[in-house]
Every structure is written in structure tokens, then in C-alpha cells.
């Protein structure tokens, strides 16, 4: 729901719930609705549905709720981006039976605004040394070299978003990708920090030189 607040007012959020026979919530789908000129309304569920993705009954409930929502908003399409492994054949079978079309035609990582795949590093139960040991030798060298040269990393505040955004704008201009306005990152911070978001900045000789915004979702970080 916090993410839905970030997307306002351009997107209208709705939440669909699935319940068991005892009215316990067993699944949810946070849907964002937006009007697209000429085409009409579209519905989008980032990282949804949230449920046992192999429970066909729950998926059916959530899909039924999405269809009712589509009628309410006269939406032409629902796009979901579930957190599942790309080769999960059972899930692919279920969603296909429910009428979804799996988009497999992206040829390149950057073919779409949202990458088709994400790459995940399991660090559960590992020490910092064990995580480092899994890196390529060159990366281990670069990380340690930065430390020896005096590069430090600190957690930033909302005010530090201005410096982070300057770095993003410079990087986007150099590498040819679009950067959201500062206000968007401030809205993210207001709705997600500190529980679901942090700002980390790297400094060299007192000057910020790079930064990252990790987003926490369940037991995972993006």
C-alpha cells in the first residue's frame, strides 16, 4: 500500500483480497489503474499477486476480483509482474489457464521500462567475507581498493536526495536513460523510509560520488 501512495495521483490504487472459508486473508493483489489517452484505462500489479503462487484457487479468486475491477474502470488490460522464477512451469500453466498471456518476446534486458528478468543473490546466513568470496576477483579488488583510497558509505537523509538526484541526472545523460524528477524520489522517501527504503551514498574526500536506493520487500531487497 505504501508503494500505491508513491504512484498517486497519476495512478489510482485498488486492493483485491482472497479469503479462505474462515475469512482469513490468503492472498492479495494491489492494482494501479491509469488512463491512457486514446486507448482507455490500464491496470498494473507490480510484484503481484502476493500469495501461494501454486494455489490455483487463490489465483482464481484474485483474477475474478481483477475482472470485476476491470469492468468498474472499463480497463482494457491487466498486467501483472509476479515474483516468480522464469522457469516455474506450474505457475505458467496456471496463469495461462486463467487467461493470462505470458510475454516472452523481450530480446534484451532493456527492451522494456521494467526489465523482463531480475538477478538475485542469496546472502542468507552468509558473512560479509563469504559474500565477497562469491564475487569475481576483479570486483573484490575494486571494492577493497575503494576502501583503501578512503571511499566511505553513509546512510543519507531526505535532504541528501538532492545530491543523489544530481548524480542520477549526470549518469542518465551520459548513458542515455531517462531519470525521474527529484519530487518522485522525495515521495518515495516520504512513503517508504525507513522501513521499506534507505538512501546510501558513497563519499570520496567529502564529496558524494555515487548512491543507491535499496527497496525492501518481504525478505528481499531490490
Regions found by a protein language model. Name each.
Residues 39-111, 218-222:
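Acyl-donor binding region in acyl/amide transferases
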Amino acid at each position: 500500500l505504501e508503494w500505491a501512495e508513491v504512484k498517486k495521483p497519476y495512478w489510482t490504487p485498488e486492493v483485491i483480497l482472497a479469503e479462505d472459508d474462515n475469512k482469513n486473508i490468503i492472498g492479495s493483489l494491489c492494482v494501479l489503474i491509469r488512463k491512457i489517452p486514446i486507448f482507455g484505462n490500464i491496470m498494473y500489479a507490480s510484484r503481484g499477486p502476493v500469495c501461494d503462487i501454486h494455489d490455483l484457487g487463490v489465483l482464481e479468486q484474485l483474477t475474478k476480483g481483477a475482472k470485476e475491477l476491470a469492468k468498474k474502470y472499463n480497463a482494457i488490460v491487466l498486467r501483472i509482474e509476479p515474483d516468480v522464477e522464469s522457469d516455474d512451469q506450474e505457475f505458467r500453466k496456471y496463469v495461462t489457464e486463467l487467461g493470462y498471456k505470458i510475454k516472452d518476446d523481450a530480446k534484451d534486458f532493456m527492451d522494456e521500462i521494467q526489465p523482463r528478468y531480475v538477478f538475485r543473490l542469496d546472502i542468507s546466513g552468509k558473512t560479509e567475507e563469504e559474500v565477497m568470496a562469491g564475487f569475481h576477483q576483479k570486483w573484490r579488488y575494486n571494492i577493497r581498493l575503494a576502501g583503501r583510497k578512503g571511499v566511505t558509505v553513509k546512510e543519507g537523509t531526505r535532504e541528501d536526495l538532492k545530491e543523489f538526484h544530481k548524480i542520477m541526472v549526470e549518469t542518465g545523460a551520459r548513458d542515455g536513460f531517462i531519470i525521474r524528477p527529484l519530487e518522485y524520489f522525495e515521495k518515495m522517501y516520504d512513503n517508504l523510509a525507513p522501513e521499506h527504503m534507505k538512501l546510501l551514498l558513497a563519499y570520496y574526500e567529502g564529496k558524494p560520488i555515487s548512491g543507491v536506493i535499496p527497496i525492501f520487500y518481504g525478505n528481499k531487497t531490490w
